Amino acid sequence: MDYVNILLGLFFTWFLVNGLMSLRRRKISKKLPPGPFPLPIIGNLHLLGNHPHKSLAQLAKIHGPIMNLKLGQLITVVISSSVVAREVLQKQDLTFSNRFVPDVVHVRNHSDFSFVWLPVNSRWRTLRKIMNSSIFSGNKLDGNQHLRSKKVQELIDYCQKCAKNGEAVDIGRATFGTTLNLLSNTIFSKDLTNPFSDSAKEFKELVWNIMVEAWKTQFGGLLSFPLRKFDPQGIKRRMTNYFTKFLGLISGLIDERLKERNLRDNANIDVLDALLNISKRTQKRLTGIKSSSCLVSLFPTPFLPFIIICPFLYLLIFHRCKVSDLNGEGSYVGGRVQLNHTPLQIGCDRLTVSNKPRNYGDSYSSFRTCLQGLILHLNTLEWANGRTTSRIHTLLAKKHKKTISQHICTSKKIKIKKLLEHFLSFGAIVKKNLPIPPGGFSSSLFHVKWRKTLSCLGYIIPKDSQVLVSVWAIGRNSDLWENPLVFKPERFWESEIDIRGRDFELIPFGAGRRICPGLPLAIRMIPVALGSLLNSFNWKLYGGIAPKDLDMEEKFGITLAKAQPLLAIPTPL
């Protein structure tokens, strides 16, 4: 009898507690942002499909710019408006400063030493300071100009060799390898691989696989039930394998440096030396795994050039653009863009052609329009006929001739500050003259995490909810952009939009404390590499494929890229 009373008491207690918690959940749920009805266990995962960025944008049209989803059992708030993004990432920056850490990133304790995943604490500030002072500071980047020139020259030489042999260039592999070795020389003072060999392809695939596995757990790995501990999808197993390979490579380089520290001239200190020196000063040995994890965080960076350059070269071919030596402003002949070569210098970097430096044209306005106008979204671009080309040329002739001349100094070199502040952007690499709003090939979604329950635009957001800011949806918001999918560069001519996290219509690098530290490197490397490729060659698709028949399927992940490699045949100018 006593057992029966105990069981009844326990049941009554459970029923009471469960009822109170249910009432609390209902009260909270009424104050949550609107969203679709979740299914048991999986929540709203079934609504995401193969292209979550597109699915979320469509759902936002139904449920509004701030939307509540359940990914598995995790409450997820999706932001698809620049106004709400400003509230989250600027006005409440500290609250939203922590990343949502995917479960698989904890393998090999990587999340404990990576400035990408660490919460905002003293360790994160130290690592961020090292990155900013040793890699991404203006003085450091300007001092490495010779290294960028060397790596771009190697890229041009490789394309020249392919042109001579009539071979196609895998643009993604070539630009990845070039930037990989630029980064590895900055960190380790040596090349990691031959940028045009199969080893570069393997390294690229290794880095990409790490990014993909980390991204999968944001959606498919969120099912909160016991089987998750057994890794039924094999994500943890694969990630452990990838990290073991990557950390083994980096750890080997660290051990090699430790052995040669006493013999090596440290006049030109690199990033690894900076880490080791900090370790020595603090009397704490920076173990191999910690150093490796810090450095592994940097290696998604080489994907940025090929994500940007591949689509632009495709669109260059698609619109039959051509760079030629002409006098005057430049013109459009037979649907082709033709430019002259008045000197242009992007900061310390000069564009390269063949085996010598080559300055670019005074009608950089035309090149700028191609660069910024064609670089972005492949799927919805609507600029394909000669009438549109003629219209753009007419607008350029009226609008940009005066603008360009204002920024050319007496030496006929365009100054970096004026050039970049008035023309270039990166991520959706365009700052002012974006023909299509951001997000085409930049990070389509990024994740932050609430530290406490708080209010946002009248809604209650529970503590530890996941927050997704949909850059892709913001960039295609018809309330924000008139005809957002139409090629219309003139929409930005009078715009003051900036990419440094102040204007939330364009945040390809994020905003607030967690804004990407690689922006200074990006705005130096991408224009020079891309400009040199265009300044040296004409390009056509491999295999006689018509541009309209090219497979333009997207590869969804932390960044958006072409699923199939872009193969193009260069022809020297």
From Swiss-Prot:
UniProt keyword list: Endoplasmic reticulum, Heme, Iron, Lipid metabolism, Membrane, Metal-binding, Monooxygenase, Oxidoreductase, Transmembrane, Transmembrane helix
Location (main, coarse): endoplasmic reticulum
First-level EC class: oxidoreductase
Molecular-function GO terms, alphabetical: fatty acid omega-hydroxylase activity; heme binding; iron ion binding; long-chain fatty acid omega-1 hydroxylase activity
Family: Belongs to the cytochrome P450 family.
GO cellular component, one term: endoplasmic reticulum membrane
Function: Cytochrome P450 hydroxylase catalyzing the conversion of decanoate (capric acid) and dodecanoate (lauric acid) to their corresponding omega-hydroxy metabolites, 10-hydroxydecanoate and 12-hydroxydodecanoate, respectively; these hydroxylated components affect plant growth, including reducing root elongation.
Identification of the protein by name: Lauric acid 10-hydroxylase
The species this protein was found in: Petunia hybrida
Pfam families reported for this sequence: p450 (PF00067)
Cofactor requirement: heme
UniProt GO BP: lauric acid metabolic process; omega-hydroxylase P450 pathway; regulation of root development
